[in-house]
Amino acid sequence: MTLNKVYYSGGEEIRDLTIVGGGPTGIFAAFQCGMNNITSRIIESMPQLGGQLAALYPEKHIYDVAGFHEVPAAGLVDSLWKQAERYHPEINLGEAVTRYRKLDDGSFETTTKSGKVFLSRALLLAAGLGAFTPRTLPQLGCVDHLEGRSIFYAVKNIRDFAGKKVVIVGGGDSALDWAVGLLDAAEHVTLVHRMHEFQGHGKTAREVDEARDKGVIDVYMDTEVTAIETAEGGMKNVTLLRKNGASVVLEADRLLILIGFRSNLGPLAEWDLELVDNALVVDSHMKTSVDGLYAAGDIAWYPGKLKIIQTGLSDAAMAVRHSLNYIRPGEKIRHTFSSVKMAKQKKNEQ
């Protein structure tokens, strides 16, 4: 994904809507702003758009987004951006929002950690689950010098594992997905799980079982990684401890730890907004407890909320649409079919 400098701004200009978070929900919200003739900006704490999909799972395939029978996470992010970029949303990357202030005229002032201040007529929080850090294996001690070289917490590039002896730790969806997904690239794959049963999707668990039965993957259940040995700055082997007390030493070039992430809303949790289960309570219009401040995606809570990408996209459309009532009060909102709007826009571009 390439972002042209024309999309960047110092924040001096007031926009109709500031979107905090540049994941799928935030990007789609920017597209919806364009469809509704709303000027927008995205503020994203990461150095790239895409949220967790780009930062953690760019090569993971997604199967539950309408219209895509299968799509790589990075491919979905690119598709969403291609929709949004025609409306030239202002993009601010590497900027972590720390506070907001509602001004006397009802507009919003949003401040980032670097001290930048952004003005907008309304505010949309689409920051997912907030800041996230991977769960580690504390029994290994300090392994900072190996992270990104021999020890990984996500698959960002399959080439990092090509031709390597890979030990994967975990029993959830990500661990199972990559136990299968790395079989063709890696020299050998070993899956280690501390529980007796997998917690991931049944279909993928069966694929792992079938691969084990064929002898193309080793699986250790009721087992933990307790130590690693290095040589010449890289990993040489890992030590496993089985529930029965037996110890196993395996040759390994790569240790892929996929046991989940800790999420933290950070400053957002201190904004005096109503929270349930570490998410912001919204009404049927995606409005929080503050007029003009909306939330969408995983950061938003309402009864029956399902935290999947598809729901986040719907939330974004709802939030943007209803923000019009706050941004331009009294204006009659008319629905325009996307095909009609695009036809007019293409005609004007000729």
From Swiss-Prot:
Sample GO molecular function, one term: NADP binding
Keywords: FAD, Flavoprotein, NADP, Oxidoreductase
Residues engaged in binding FAD: T25, E44, Q52, Y57, V97, F132, D298, S339
Reaction(s) the record says it catalyses: 2 reduced [2Fe-2S]-[ferredoxin] + NADP(+) + H(+) = 2 oxidized [2Fe-2S]-[ferredoxin] + NADPH
Superkingdom as given in the UniProt entry: Bacteria
Cofactor: FAD
Cofactor note: Binds 1 FAD per subunit.
Top EC category: oxidoreductase
Entry EC no(s): 1.18.1.2
Subunit field text: Homodimer.
PANTHER family: THIOREDOXIN REDUCTASE 1-RELATED-RELATED
Family membership: Belongs to the ferredoxin--NADP reductase type 2 family.
Protein name: Ferredoxin--NADP reductase
Organism lineage: Bacteria, Pseudomonadati, Chlorobiota, Chlorobiia, Chlorobiales
